A protein has these predicted regions:
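RNA-interacting cores
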Residues: 1-252
Length: 252
């Protein structure tokens, strides 16, 4: 069966209470309330989850985005939300009901992504917008600014967790791969993501990566980063962190 990446957006009527991206952890609870026991048990285990989700605003309209990386996650998490009978979302912890104005659903196959990136001729520059607080964890310490090493390792781990029928031979020597990557521009600020009673130090903003090396490596990085739009980058992407949007620019 072909791997399909899916993105679902629920647009809500603006509530009287102003909401922020921190509501994402509560939205995660909404998702898990609907799943089967077996799937729920798997999701409570450590490891990369086959989905990401986050809360944001588009033109002042509240939007909940859920990305799924395999068929099981799509069936368990998203299909109940796409049902015609699902017109509202109730947030028990907030005693708040969000009225759904519209739903959008799009999908792309791994094969199509490969054609658009790996078998294409991509730019050596790519800009990432970190839409929600992003952080990494190394040696039990939070890393709340981006480095090429943390970004690349996160993308490779999430790619491998997707179960794609492919091997990333380029990354057998991570140090060599990192020599081809450089952050050449950034506009970032530090922030915190509130998760229950914990404040996770994190960052938001934009960076521009310059990718050197063979064109095939450039294309492969574009493939990984495009998958990052669905999988997220960094830690706790199933809880609302690490949402990424991509803006490419032509090589100068």
């Amino acid at each position: 069966m072909a791997n399909i990446l899916r993105k679902t957006k629920l647009y809500f009527k603006t509530p009287d209470t102003k909401l922020s991206y921190n509501i994402s952890s509560i939205m995660q609870g909404v998702l898990m309330d609907k799943v089967s026991y077996g799937f729920g048990e798997k999701m409570h285990q450590n490891g990369i989850k086959p989905y990401s989700q986050y809360f944001s605003y588009e033109d002042d309209v509240p939007v909940w985005t859920i990305n799924t990386l395999n068929e099981e996650a799509e069936s368990e998490l998203v299909q109940p939300l796409l049902d015609e009978g699902c017109q509202k979302i109730y947030l028990r912890q907030k005693n708040l009901t969000l009225e759904i104005l519209k739903k959008e659903h799009q999908e792309v196959s791994y094969d199509a992504l490969m054609q658009d990136t790996f078998f294409s001729s991509c730019s050596r520059y790519i800009t990432l917008k970190f839409k929600t607080p992003t952080s990494f964890k190394t040696n039990n310490q939070y890393q709340f600014y981006p480095t090429t090493e943390h970004i690349l390792k996160s993308l490779v781990n999430k790619f491998n967790a997707c179960g794609f029928d492919a091997e990333l031979d380029y990354f057998e020597d991570m140090e060599e791969a990192l020599q081809h990557m450089q952050i050449v521009n950034y506009s970032l600020h530090s922030t915190q993501f509130y998760l229950e009673h914990t404040k996770i130090p994190s960052f938001m903003g934009r960076i521009t990566l310059k990718i050197a090396g063979p064109q095939q490596f450039v294309n492969l990085m574009h493939l990984l980063i495009h998958i990052g739009e669905y999988a997220g980058i960094g830690i706790k992407t199933a809880m609302g962190m690490g949402a990424v949007e991509i803006t490419e620019r032509k090589e100068k």
